[in-house]
Amino acid sequence: MGQVVVITGLADGMGREAAKLLAAAGDTIAGFDMDAAGIASLQTELDGLSPSSGKTHYLVPLNILDRPGILRFRDEVLAKYKRVDTVLSNVGIGFFGPFEEIDLEAARRCLEINVIGAAAIFQAFLPAMRRQGSGKLIAMSSLVGQVPFPFESIYSASKFAIEGMVMSLRYEVAPFGIRVALIEPAQVSTTFAAKIHTLPPEGSPYRERARRFIARDDELIKTAPTPLQAARRIAEIIHQDRPDFHNQVDFMSTFFLFLNRFLPVRLRDMILLNHMDIQ
């Protein structure tokens, strides 16, 4: 029997491709995203992938910061499907810039969307999973949740927070048969980075190093996994009964997490800064 999978942030990118793969495999998708047009077109695609099964997927436009809306969505999903098997928290925004120059209100928004957004969707569905005695809570983290990169201090902080929150959560929910996991990609060839890569202003002491970082990042993205390639790994993790707690999507993430585990910090930093052309 297919799973009922809740996905946030599925209008494009990895979330969209994962939803299509899961639906094609016989799973039922419920999810939301702020992009109403993207959600509508995905609904049509998903319904076309499983017409013979009679399954209906449930997608709605919704802001991750709309807490009452999330609870209504939860109630509608449970009324429609009677259970939920997996929740994938995939909503997130990036944040780039020298720490000295960042807008703290914008930083607060990033932290609220990335961290409290994940907490909100997990908290909404956790009681149902506890009552049914099973379920998986999966959070989209990042390589920078363990290995911070320069000019990504706030984004790194949000992913470090997700990792700590989910680590603690897994101890609390394990007695109820609920599994918890993290997915930690480094780079995927989407427009995610391009949307946030803004050079510091003329005269900034950080401008030249930030320029080199952006140029190198743009170069690396050209050979990064596609959203579909990343989604195949995500779908694989969702379909595992007992997924590993830490899960990587690409070589870069696996490589730097290996360095982080076994090398002295000074040597790891030297390799990282050389890799990003800002040594």
Model-derived features: where do they sit?
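SDR active-site lid
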Residues: 175-244
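The beta1-alpha1 cofactor-binding region of Rossmann-like NAD(H)/NADP(H)-dependent oxidoreductases
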Residues: 61-72, 104
